[in-house]
Amino acid sequence: MRMTREQDLGRRGEDLAAQHLIERGYALVERNWRCREGEVDLVMTHGGTTVLVEVKTRAGLRYGHPLEAVTRAKAARLRVLAGLWRQAHPERRGPVRIDVVGVVWPRGGQPSVEVVRSAC
């Protein structure tokens, strides 16, 4: 099945976000973890903390910065997903936080990446 342009942009944004975080000392644990309540884009570790990462990617700022797409409702859902992830992975002890990564990747241009730690 072919990806839509939006799906391809989202996948490339997740790839770039993962690489960006790895270059800053994060380690990738899992991609696209799914459960009945939704999906976590990236699960990583950073300094002994498990980090669930939501990645938002846009081709431009016409509809606002991608970080603006994380509404209160989305943040609440991410917190629920964090709890469910912990239940599914009892072997992973220690702190958990939620980071959000905004990627702006204009057609034919250079992408920019912004990370908000402990966003939710």
UniProtKB/Swiss-Prot annotation:
InterPro entries: Restrct_endonuc-II-like, tRNA_endonuc-like_dom_sf, UPF0102_YraN-like. CDD domains: PoNe_Nuclease (cd20736). It holds the Pfam family UPF0102. One of its GO terms (molecular function) is nucleic acid binding. Belongs to the UPF0102 family. This is UPF0102 protein CMS0765. It comes from Clavibacter sepedonicus.
